[in-house]
Amino acid sequence: MKISLVSISELIEGEIIGDENKVICGVAPFEEATSQDITYAGSTKYLKKIYDSNAGAIIVPRDFQTSDKDIIKADNPRVAFAQVVNFFHPKS
């Protein structure tokens, strides 16, 4: 399954900073994400490591300062990421 960042941002009511047409193919934990995955950084621990991440996109808190990564700002990154996980892996 594939989805664009703009579609993800609409799903989670987030704000994209970066390439809104980027296509995401999956979800992964922060330290395991590849260039085709989206992940989230909801704590200071992970926000400090954002520049080292290989993720294609990262969901961050709305007050996070802009980075050179493709990000989606959300009110609650953990909840937003859970919504994206449910999109990729719907419960039957």
PLM regions with names:
Residues 1-92:
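Terminal amphipathic alpha-helical/low-complexity segments used for targeting or macromolecular assembly
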